[in-house]
């Protein structure tokens, strides 16, 4: 029997920033080393859960899609009962569960996870929204445990400066870390994994190379 509860990793961010792409990449990289499951949140559908299943991220019984209705942030903050129930269900199905990724529905920069629901929070933004996003602040930018700045390969095409985003992220976050990624190509993924293992106090499994 395992000696500690499953690590709950909340992954938030605006629509289209790359949350589901990050969850998919994390599952595929870690599933042979850890007992993993996923909870996704969508307002009216289970689209993200179905996407992860279709793309073979995990077996279907390890993915639960929650239909939140209304504002997505309510289901991860003010009333997290549906998500807590889903996490509880997964723990019952898989007693050896080590990590649960909880993907929020797409929301604005003010969305945050309840500490009752998430042990670690990752917040995903993308350069296509403009290099001004980090300095706009909001709890996702300033208080998440890790800020993921995705789609860096598209920066030149949309006129976004990674140097500006780097500077503003440092100013807004202080000592809190951030990582630039191109999840489509896997760039930066190992650094995200290393952060989760280190800060989530997971045992580094044999065969999983350090970042």
Swiss-Prot record:
GTP binds at residues 13-20. It is found in: Cytoplasm. The gene is ureG. Facilitates the functional incorporation of the urease nickel metallocenter. This process requires GTP hydrolysis, probably effectuated by UreG. Pfam families: cobW (PF02492). GO terms for molecular function: GTP binding; GTPase activity; nickel cation binding. One of its GO terms (cellular component) is cytoplasm. Its main location: cytoplasm. Homodimer. UreD, UreF and UreG form a complex that acts as a GTP-hydrolysis-dependent molecular chaperone, activating the urease apoprotein by helping to assemble the nickel containing metallocenter of UreC. The UreE protein probably delivers the nickel. The keyword Cytoplasm applies. InterPro entries: CobW/HypB/UreG_nucleotide-bd (IPR003495), P-loop_NTPase (IPR027417), UreG (IPR004400). PANTHER family: UREASE ACCESSORY PROTEIN G (PTHR31715:SF0). It comes from the Bacteria. Keywords: Chaperone, Cytoplasm, GTP-binding, Nickel insertion, Nucleotide-binding. One of its GO terms (biological process) is urea catabolic process. Belongs to the SIMIBI class G3E GTPase family. UreG subfamily. The lineage of its organism: Bacteria, Pseudomonadati, Pseudomonadota, Gammaproteobacteria, Chromatiales. This is Urease accessory protein UreG.
């Amino acid at each position: 029997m395992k000696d500690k509860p499953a690590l709950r990793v909340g992954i938030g961010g605006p629509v289209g920033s790359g949350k589901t792409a990050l969850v998919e990449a994390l599952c595929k990289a870690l599933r042979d080393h850890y007992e993993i499951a996923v909870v996704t949140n969508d307002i009216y559908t289970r689209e993200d859960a179905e996407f992860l299943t279709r793309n073979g991220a995990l077996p279907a019984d390890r993915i639960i899609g929650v239909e939140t209705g209304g504002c997505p942030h309510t289901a991860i903050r003010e009333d997290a009962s549906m998500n807590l129930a889903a996490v509880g269900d997964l723990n019952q199905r898989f007693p050896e569960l080590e990590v649960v990724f909880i993907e929020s529905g797409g929301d604005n920069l003010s969305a945050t996870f309840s500490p009752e629901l998430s042990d670690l929070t990752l917040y995903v933004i993308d350069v296509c929204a403009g290099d001004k996003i980090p300095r706009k602040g909001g709890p996702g930018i300033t208080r998440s445990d890790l800020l993921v700045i995705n789609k860096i390969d598209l920066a030149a095409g949309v006129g976004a400066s990674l140097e500006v985003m780097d500077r503003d992220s440092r100013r807004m976050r202080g000592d809190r870390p951030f990582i630039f990624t191109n999840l489509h190509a896997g760039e930066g993924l190992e650094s995200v994994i290393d952060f989760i293992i280190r800060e989530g106090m997971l045992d580094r499994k044999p065969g999983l190379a350090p970042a």
